[in-house]
Amino acid sequence: MTQPKVVNEQVDVTALYFRKSKNGLKSFPKRIEYEGEALTFMESGLQIMVNKGQELIELFTMTDGRSDYRLRHNVTAKEWTLMTISQNA
């Protein structure tokens, strides 16, 4: 894996998928729009939830099989941010 490219741009999540968990269903981004392209992720990913004051932040690490993407979802503000892209070797 190469050094991650820092992006820090808001993106649109155009599709979600759901996975069973102990507490019900968890949602994950399935497809985003970035620089005019639709990027579709494989249905495997990591999710971390963080409370930052009054805000609930979800951090996701997703892959399309070629690159890894780190996304930040501000649940309170309903904003998605593409933080980094890392090319797989």
Feature map (PLM): residue ranges:
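Cysteine-centric segments in proteins
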Residues: 1-89
